[in-house]
């Protein structure tokens, strides 16, 4: 305080340093953090800490695959018959024995540019075991079975005991779950001290990669842009739908939705949760391809850089 230090930020880091005598996230660790909070209050110092172990981004051993970052996955099957078929479609590649079907589409096979109106939506003909029953029109068709799975992305640079999957950045419910698990033993003291002293939480530079799906992505997309997402799903599998121009326009809209969901549901919701407790928010608003930095920066109280 005499030297002009007004506060500090605490990181539970685990990269490049020896493992200490106190186990990360243990009861002893919690007691030490609570002691640090009280000492900061006594000394008139601002206490801030990262929102999860490590320094990026929001995860831990409590995050299950259904609450982790979600990505789209698909399999392809060619068929050439003009009659009813009952066929087992291959399950798309997935992680952690976690997979949910989203759409089943049929598109004309061997076409460089796929007319939008030729894409058939067959999801209601696909059963829970991945068996498709369909009266196939004459011609050669490519069946695309789309689904979602969890991304194998963990919080960065955390001790091994407190490393786990990173939460879904497009889901406020997943972020709520993470924050509740991380701070359930600390938040009562933090909220109490925040009434008369400075307490902060931080999302450091974003280093846990992209995601491209969440359960309500189709509804959010249609509400934002006024057209359905599913006919353009083949674009995410490197195909051209309608025209090159239409495909590029869809990709712009899709990336816009990702950026909006990321800013609103991750950074914006983090700010909302912290504000409810009287806690100041910090961020380094950069590091990920799916973010618009200025859109992210305006969500939180204080922006930072590093050098």
Where are the predicted features?
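Generic beta-strand/beta-sheet core signal
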Residues: 10-13, 50, 203-204, 280-286, ...
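Carbohydrate-binding surfaces in secreted/extracellular proteins
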Residues: 47, 270, 281
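Hydrophobic targeting/anchoring helices
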Residues: 56-61, 277-307
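Active-site-adjacent structural elements in folded domains
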Residues: 253, 257, 261, 285-290
């Amino acid at each position: 305080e005499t030297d002009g230090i007004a506060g500090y930020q605490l990181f539970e880091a685990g990269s490049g340093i020896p493992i200490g005598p106190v186990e990360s996230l243990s009861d002893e660790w919690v007691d030490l953090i609570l002691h640090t909070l009280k000492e900061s209050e006594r000394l008139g110092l601002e206490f801030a800490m990262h929102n999860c172990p490590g320094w990026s981004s929001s995860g831990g051993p409590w995050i299950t695959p259904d609450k982790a970052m979600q990505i789209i996955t698909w399999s392809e099957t060619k068929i050439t018959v003009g009659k009813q078929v009952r066929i087992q479609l291959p399950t798309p590649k997935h992680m952690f024995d976690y997979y949910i079907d989203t759409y089943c589409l049929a598109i004309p096979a061997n076409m460089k540019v796929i007319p939008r109106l030729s894409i058939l939506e067959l999801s209601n003909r696909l059963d829970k075991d991945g068996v498709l029953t369909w009266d196939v029109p004459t011609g050669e068709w490519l069946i695309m079975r789309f689904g979602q799975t969890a991304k194998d992305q963990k919080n960065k640079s955390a001790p091994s005991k407190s490393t786990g999957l990173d939460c879904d950045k497009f889901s406020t419910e997943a972020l709520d779950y993470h924050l509740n698990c991380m701070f359930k033993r600390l938040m009562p003291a933090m909220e109490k001290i925040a009434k008369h002293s400075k307490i902060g939480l931080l999302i450091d530079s974003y280093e846990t990669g992209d995601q491209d799906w969440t359960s309500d992505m189709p509804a959010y997309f249609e509400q934002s842009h006024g057209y359905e997402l599913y006919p353009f799903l083949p674009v995410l599998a490197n195909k051209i739908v309608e025209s090159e121009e239409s495909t590029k326009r869809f990709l712009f809209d899709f990336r816009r939705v990702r950026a909006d969901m990321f800013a609103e549901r991750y950074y914006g919701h983090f700010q909302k949760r912290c504000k409810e407790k009287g806690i100041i928010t910090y961020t380094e608003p950069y590091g990920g391809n799916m973010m618009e930095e200025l859109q992210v920066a305006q969500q939180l109280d204080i922006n930072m850089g590093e050098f």
